[in-house]
């Protein structure tokens, strides 16, 4: 599914990451550990792939994985997902985040069938606030920290 065709689905998926979080103590990721936990709530945990950090113009781009405690409803009726892999763009100066790509998987840790896909072109990115102490905020803080 292309997000431009159904922006409501994209916004609802993004809303799942705007929940308050308890900050996870950051530990350095090793070469064998692709995903590094950065945020955890009662219903989800967010991970980043440090090797995916890249500058795209004035923005930082990074891959993230989210595991949900309970299955989340997918756009397709009767389908649910328990994990997502996304490519986010971050505007560090404005504390904004936009989702470039998203794949939702039936099981945790990106396992099982892909039940939903979304992709947005650079000109159609929907920028959302990334307040501190939310999943988006923690993802942005990780992406934007000086290296």
Give the ranges of each region predicted by the language model.
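Bacterial N-terminal signal peptides
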Residues: 11-20
